Amino acid sequence: MRKQLGEAVGEVKTDIEIARAARKQPIMEVGARLGIPPEHLLPYGHDKAKVSAEFIAAQREKKNGRLILVTAINPTPAGEGKTTTTVGLVDGLNRIGKKAIVCIREASLGPCFGIKGGAAGGGYAQVVPMEDINLHFTGDFHAITSAHNLLSALIDNHIYWGNEQAIDIRRIAWRRVMDMNDRALRHIVGSLGGVANGYPRETGFDITVASEVMAILCLAMDIRDLERRLGNIIIGYRRDKSPVYARDIKADGAMAVLLKDAMQPNLVQTLENNPAFVHGGPFANIAHGCNSVVATTTALKLADYVVTEAGFGADLGAEKFFDIKCRKAGLMPDAAVIVATVRAIKMNGGVKKEDLAKENVEALRKGCPNLGRHIQNVKKFGVPVLVAINHFTSDTEAEIQAIKDYVRTLGSEAVLCKHWAEGSAGIEELADKVADLADAGHSQFSPLYPDEMPLFQKIEAIAKDIYHASEVIADKLVRDQLRIWEDQGYGHLPICMAKTQYSFSTDPNLRGAPTGHTVPIREVRLAAGAGFIVVITGEIMTMPGLPKVPSSERIRLDEEGYIEGLF
């Protein structure tokens, strides 16, 4: 835990203590400042609400504000404060007189109880109510999990009652999900126990944030688009290898009903009472890593500046933000911010985790090429970029200056940010520079590859241009499957790479800015409803496991019933 503002007088507060002490405004007042009438806010208590679909539809002809992406370098396991910086930047923009909204993802229970913690920011740059957001919030993840598992149940039920669609039980592509890290459920055998329980088959669970239903909710433009996409989900194949869709077993309507309310964005506020949309939550290492299109496009109609994040490093989240979300939603980003920390750069320079707090300018300079590659990669999309140095108390002036000097050699600028400890006052400089950059009109956004490029070449484009790999390794089965999907009319879809977040390569231990490595493809999955091809590389898992000492061991209720240990 880093020391907080006020440490000189011995005042040390945890994230949850800071959040609990926040002076929140009634959510109706937050909405009123955005021009949302109370009848179009569906309240969940006094501090959170959903925005009605009717209000959202009425905003479509309005002019868009500026769109700013916050991404990061390859992180340490604890993360580098990307959400914290996203929230802090919006507070900073509002502090300097700009009308800004933050758009971030909802938290998954997996990392909350695992190693990474929640997704509400930290220190004095948080969205609140932090406890609700990090736990059950408005029930969106429950709805997504329920809709996904309804389809799973309907598949087995369809087979049990005669299998009218002639589904080949060896080729069922749809698994089950739960919002928890549980390695024991990765591969299981279901329907054991006799004839009454159905046909035994191998299956498994993924984490909810890897669900195609999550991706669909985050990419759908409205409820009708949502239902259409749900119907397009491929649940498996027949013996002649023709696909079976969710609509073929009449699952799409009921799934859409379960997701009707979840489709509406959630409005909350920052510690400084600025508006925040928190909606959707796909991971960026095993999914596309962006908040919902509906939340982002709505925010763009209501504010002059919208700041959103994309998960993990720019090799994952930012690439998918540009190549999937912006491509599919017609978004045009105006600027990007790459969050870097001294500790993450030193880790990329070879410093061990236990030594990250010690000054080591030489190792930092050795790790800077990791930051440099992320800067160059973002610029490949035609988007101008700034670097935010998220300050830790262990950082030294020499280390901070070394980062600034390095970034300057690449034609960009790095700005020291202390929003974690000081709130908006600690990020004013970055806010000024980001607003100027976004307003300058320098962005010439273009995706990395065209729609018409063959699928395998799209994979190679990402691997070679973004990861700097020398080769993509895929066996005949993978290549043949990609060609079959092209023949079936799916060749125009973008690629969603599932890869470790800790390295440009598929080896989490290969730090820095490696070149000449290979990218082995283990599996490919067609997410026809979401509208992309998932390419699973290396040892990445779509159902994570818990660490040896999970965060859950520190989470409890105190004697008065208040939560302790959540971060």
Swiss-Prot record:
Pathway the protein acts in: One-carbon metabolism; tetrahydrofolate interconversion
Stored InterPro entries: Formate_THF_ligase, Formate_THF_ligase_CS, P-loop_NTPase
Residues binding ATP: T76, P77, A78, G79, E80, G81, K82, T83
GO molecular function, one term: ATP binding
HAMAP family named among the record's database cross-references: FTHFS
Entry similarity comment: Belongs to the formate--tetrahydrofolate ligase family.
Listed name of the protein: Formate--tetrahydrofolate ligase
Encoding gene per record: fhs
